[in-house]
Amino acid sequence: MSIITVYSGSFCNEEAVVRALVARTGYQLVSDADLVAEAAKLSGIPEPKIDRVFSARPSVFNKFTHERERSLAHLRLAAARAVVANNLVISGYGGQLVSRTINHVLRVCLIADRKARTAQAAAAMQVTDQDAAKLIQKQDEDRAEWVRALFDHTDPWAPQLYDMVLPTDK
């Protein structure tokens, strides 16, 4: 297996899983920050503007500037350049950018039920369950919009998008 992508719901232990995966395989980690930095270098668009493409809400000026579309195009280019190398773990939103026509990619999704994620978020951030649930709802909306924009699919955790869907709360 040359490339492993890991996409995760928030508070599903993605960082720990990816860290262990990289340590065990010796593969190079490519993060969203790496892809954003490369896309910024390729395009001349500042990193914070490119990073906004991961948010469900586009800029109010997007109709005029097409900033979201330009940022996404450069992120796709950065991902395409990254996958030329072998033995990669691509974690985060960027893993969804790897072409579906590449057959040596293992696509993994990490997810847990909302109750477990809320409890983990509340403990980690020292906030109420209600505040944690609001944060998770917002982050899930961002992930759902990302998957909708790329694949016209409404469920970011849909099994047909991945080779493996692993529950992290079991």
What are these regions (language model features)?
Residues 3-5, 87-89:
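Residue-level preference for the first positions of well-ordered beta-strands
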Residues 5-22:
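Glycine-rich phosphate-binding P-loop
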Residues 34-87, 94:
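ATP-dependent small-molecule kinase phosphotransfer cores
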Residues 95-96, 112-117, 170:
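Conserved nucleotide-binding/hydrolysis micro-motifs of P-loop NTPases
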Residues 97-103, 157-159:
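Short loop/helix-cap segments at secondary-structure boundaries that form the rim of catalytic
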Residues 101-124, 129-139:
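Conserved phosphate-donor/acceptor-positioning beta-strand/loop module used by diverse small-molecule
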Residues 129-170:
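Small-molecule kinase domains that catalyze NTP-dependent phosphoryl transfer to phosphate-bearing small molecules
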